[in-house]
Every structure is written in structure tokens, then in C-alpha cells.
């Protein structure tokens, strides 16, 4: 199967969705040789991955993952592909906490650091989250308190079959975008940051095919995989069964432009402190970018009608201490579960 696929890819032909599914299934099974897997990954990188290919791969990875079956019918995720080289603090992690304080159910899917000094798993550990929590307890945490963390290696066990190859290749592959597309809770809403403008529309199309109801796939003009505050941001939104493209400018929402260095984080310990300071009400560019992205999460989470209202609600949740209280409440409940 893989040899046939390589022939096709090398001839610059796209795989059909079902072929891509079969290829990824074979890779996940552990039966594929490293050289064939490497050939597929590099071939795809050179050809460029199609929407059908990414969809097929994502479906196979979802089917090979340990699933988290939630009773709630609408759950969201806030995450990025990483790899944007921006050295920012963990914005989407702060956003997840604020969204859950507004009553949005958040299944935060993530891993340790890839391109930064601190991934969502690293910073959540610093904040007191048990990232190795068994799925059954994580499920209760999301259902009862509105937010839980799904540590990717715990759910995507078959990924160990490609970990060594990805490290050896040392270049971006399709797996860099598959992480955020394969949340084991099968979330219906998503704010997804990507490292390349060319990915926003295709990945929104993929999310649509995967059954996503509402999503914003975003990429800042400055290169960040967030809705940025140093420049406008490209957005491809999944809305009512279609993908629409537009641009968000922070100044239109009363948020002043920041400098990239204003948004930088350091290691997990410092990033956790940045998040706590924001939740305690500290003002400035770091809070601004969190509020703007939280507004998007509240919009995707169906608690506000638009970003303007989302910004008001996010600011309210911070200023009243409700967001910080929510974090305390989640950690307290986690302690009881453990």
C-alpha cells in the first residue's frame, strides 16, 4: 500500500481520502518500515498535502486514538500547530481557562514543547494540572468543571511508531498539522492557530469534513499561530457548513498594536506566572492578546454573538476574578478526583 502511495505522490498526484486513510492506518499499525514512512512524509511535504489527504490521515488517527466520550454535545478546543517561531507565552492555554469560566466546555488537547520552550502540557503542569490523568477522570473534570487536558501521547499511543522518524527528519511534516485535528474528544468547535497563511483555508475545509460545527483557523500577518495584536490576522471560519475568509484587525476592537517582544514568554514556570498575572487582572499587551483570543473562543463556544461581545465578557471574567476562581475550582476538583 505505502509503495503504491509513494509512486503516486512522487508523480505529484494527490491520494484520495480513502487511500490516505489506509496509508495512515498502516503507519499507525506499526507495520510500516521507517524508510517507507519517511518517503511518504517527505514526498507529501514536497508535493503539498491536499485537503483529502489531510482529512483521510486525521480520520485514521482519530480511529486509532483512545477516545474520550463526553456526554456534552458541544465541546471546543483552543490550540495551535506551534512551529511559528514566535516565542510567545501559552496564549491558548490562558484562553481555555477563561472560556471555561464562561460555561464553555473545553477539552484542551496538547503536548510538551515542540518549537517553544513551553508547550501547553508544560505550562499546565506548572499551574498544577495532572497531565497524566486517566481518561475517565479527565472526562469527569470536563463534564463537572468545564475544562480538562488531553495529553496527546496518552491518547495517541500509536504515534510512538513515528516519533523517531519525525525527530530524524528534523523538518515539518503533515504530523505538525494533524495534532490539532485529532482531538480524542471529537470536539465540535475549534479555534486553531496555524504557522502558515496557506493553511488557514485548507484546514478549515478539513475541519468541515471532520464534522466540526464552528471553527476559526487563524494566522497572524506577523507569522503567529494566534489572533495576533501586532498586526491583522487572516481567518478562515467554518460557519453554517461553509468556509469564509476574512481579516481581523485588533484596532477595530479597540486593542492597540503591540510589539512581538511584548508577547514573548520564557520557560514553563515563567509562562504559568504570566497566565496567573493576567487572571489576577494585570493589564498590558499580554492581557490584550489573551482577551482577543478568548473572545474568539467564546464566539466559537456559542456564548457570544461576535468578537466585540466576546471581548466584553472576557474582560468581565478577568476583572471580577471569575476566571481565576475557575482555575482554582478545576484544580480543587482534580485533587478530589485523584
UniProtKB/Swiss-Prot annotation:
E.C. designation(s): 2.4.2.18
- The residues that the entry says bind anthranilate 1 are 80, 111
Q: Which named protein is this?
A: Anthranilate phosphoribosyltransferase
This protein's pathway: Amino-acid biosynthesis; L-tryptophan biosynthesis; L-tryptophan from chorismate: step 2/5
Gene Ontology biological process terms from the UniProt entry: L-tryptophan biosynthetic process
Q: Which reaction does it catalyse?
A: N-(5-phospho-beta-D-ribosyl)anthranilate + diphosphate = 5-phospho-alpha-D-ribose 1-diphosphate + anthranilate
InterPro entries found in the cross-reference section? Anthranilate_Pribosyl_Tfrase (IPR005940), Glycosyl_Trfase_fam3 (IPR000312), Glycosyl_Trfase_fam3_N_dom (IPR017459), Glycosyl_Trfase_fam3_N_dom_sf (IPR036320), Nuc_phospho_transferase (IPR035902)
Q: What class of enzyme is it?
A: transferase
Amino acid at each position: 500500500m505505502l509503495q503504491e502511495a509513494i509512486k503516486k505522490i512522487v508523480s505529484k498526484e494527490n491520494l484520495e481520502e480513502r487511500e490516505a486513510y489506509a496509508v495512515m492506518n498502516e503507519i499507525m499499525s506499526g507495520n510500516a518500515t521507517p524508510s517507507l514512512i519517511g518517503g511518504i512524509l517527505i514526498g507529501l511535504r514536497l508535493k503539498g498535502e491536499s485537503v483529502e489527504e489531510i482529512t483521510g490521515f486525521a480520520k485514521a488517527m482519530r480511529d486509532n486514538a483512545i477516545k474520550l466520550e463526553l456526554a456534552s454535545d458541544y465541546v471546543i478546543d483552543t490550540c495551535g500547530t506551534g512551529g511559528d517561531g514566535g516565542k510567545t507565552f501559552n496564549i491558548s492555554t490562558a484562553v481555555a481557562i477563561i472560556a471555561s469560566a464562561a460555561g464553555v466546555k473545553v477539552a484542551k488537547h496538547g503536548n510538551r514543547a515542540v518549537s517553544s520552550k513551553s508547550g501547553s502540557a508544560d505550562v499546565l503542569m506548572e499551574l498544577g494540572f495532572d497531565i497524566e490523568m486517566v481518561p475517565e477522570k479527565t472526562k469527569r473534570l470536563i463534564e463537572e468543571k468545564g475544562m480538562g487536558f488531553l495529553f496527546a501521547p496518552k491518547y495517541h499511543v500509536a504515534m510512538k511508531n513515528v516519533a523517531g522518524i519525525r525527530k530524524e527528519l528534523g523538518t515539518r511534516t503533515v504530523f505538525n498539522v494533524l495534532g490539532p485535528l485529532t482531538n480524542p474528544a471529537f470536539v465540535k468547535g475549534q479555534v486553531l492557530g496555524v504557522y502558515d497563511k496557506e493553511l488557514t483555508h485548507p484546514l478549515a475545509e478539513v475541519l468541515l469534513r471532520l464534522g466540526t460545527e464552528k471553527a476559526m483557523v487563524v494566522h497572524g500577518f506577523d507569522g503567529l499561530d494566534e489572533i495576533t495584536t501586532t498586526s491583522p490576522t487572516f481567518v478562515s471560519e467554518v460557519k453554517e457548513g461553509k468556509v469564509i475568509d476574512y481579516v481581523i484587525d485588533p484596532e477595530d476592537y479597540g486593542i492597540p498594536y503591540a510589539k512581538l517582544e511584548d508577547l514573548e514568554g520564557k520557560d514553563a514556570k515563567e509562562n504559568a506566572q504570566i497566565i496567573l498575572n493576567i487572571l489576577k487582572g494585570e493589564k498590558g499587551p499580554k492581557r490584550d492578546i489573551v482577551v482577543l483570543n478568548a473572545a474568539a473562543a467564546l464566539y466559537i463556544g456559542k456564548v457570544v454573538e461576535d468578537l466585540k461581545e466576546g471581548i466584553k465578557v472576557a474582560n468581565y471574567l478577568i476583572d471580577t476574578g471569575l476566571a481565576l476562581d475557575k482555575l482554582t475550582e478545576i484544580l480543587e476538583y482534580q485533587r478530589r478526583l485523584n
